[in-house]
Amino acid sequence: MGQKIHPTGFRLPVTRNWSSRWYANNRNFAGMLAEDIEVREFLKKKLKNAAVSRVTIERPAKNARITIYSARPGVVIGKKGEDIENLKLELAKMLKVPVAVNIEEVRKPEVDAQLIAESITQQLEKRIMFRRAMKRAMQNAMRLGAQGIKIMSAGRLNGIEIARTEWYREGRVPLHTLRADIDYGTAEAKTTYGVIGVKVWVYRGDRLANGDAPVMRGEDRPEDDRRRRNPRGDRPGDRRGPGAGRGGPGAGRGPADGASAAPSGDAKPGVKRVVRAAPPAAKGE
């Protein structure tokens, strides 16, 4: 059921990591989880034009550390760092603890699934044909290093009366392979006909457990450098014949009694002649 389950949750113990990294007891867990959801919704609205890919939240020792991954870090920081300072104050008021905000730049937004989904929804809201937007995003992703991409759009596409689902795929998208680095993102386009949902899967190669080291494939493995051993009969100084040392019944024996040796080449095998003895004469004859 790799096609139905959430790709990130499916790979959490293997190649992915949690977006919220903290520990809480049973009494405080629900409240802290609700705060994380509230912070993410606030940042999504506040930084709508900053191309935010994802947000990670850490809570070390009565503090909070929030990392924002954005393709436009300058929009988040603002002029002379004013916007990020105001953002820290608002987040500290929400979480009621000191907050440190870090900005990480997304180098290739064309390969980020969340940014691809948001880009397609923005084009759909501007009345651009959904097929054109999807195929353009797929071409850009494959050109910049993605090994596979799948995009699905669902809703009243092109304003039709009955909602439907269409998807396109290019390259490989192995959803069942746990070591595959599958990036997944969703977004919604609010059009005059209704809401259109967009889902994006991007395959960026294979990874080892929670690391960036690529997995060596079968065709990329180096050849075995060990020196292969020659057959026993070809070894120098071996006085035994090529068939010596073989086990099994009849090993080392010559031909059976009364049987001719095995023919060599194209010579026809000899025919064994059988002579029957005459029966003994009856008594009294």
UniProtKB/Swiss-Prot annotation:
Instruction: Give the span(s) annotated as Disordered.
Output: 211-285
Q: Which GO terms describe its molecular function?
A: mRNA binding; rRNA binding; structural constituent of ribosome
Q: Which SMART domains match?
A: KH
UniProt keywords, alphabetically: Ribonucleoprotein, Ribosomal protein, RNA-binding, rRNA-binding
From start to end residue, where is composition biased (Gly residues)?
Answer: 242-255
Q: Where is the composition biased (Basic and acidic residues)?
A: 217-241
Composition bias, Low complexity? 256-267, 276-285
Q: Which GO terms describe its biological process?
A: translation
**What InterPro entries does its record include?**
KH_dom, KH_dom-like_a/b, KH_dom_type_2, KH_sf_prok-type, Ribosomal_S3_C_sf, Ribosomal_uS3_bac-typ, Ribosomal_uS3_C, Ribosomal_uS3_CS
Instruction: Tell me where in this chain the KH type-2 domain is found.
Output: 39-107
Q: Which GO terms describe its cellular component?
A: cytosolic small ribosomal subunit
Family assignment? Belongs to the universal ribosomal protein uS3 family.
Q: Which NCBIfam families match?
A: rpsC_bact
Q: How does it assemble?
A: Part of the 30S ribosomal subunit. Forms a tight complex with proteins S10 and S14.
Annotated function = Binds the lower part of the 30S subunit head. Binds mRNA in the 70S ribosome, positioning it for translation.
Task: Return the protein name.
Answer: Small ribosomal subunit protein uS3
Query: Which classification does the entry list for the species?
Result: Bacteria, Pseudomonadati, Pseudomonadota, Betaproteobacteria, Burkholderiales
Q: Gene for this protein?
A: rpsC
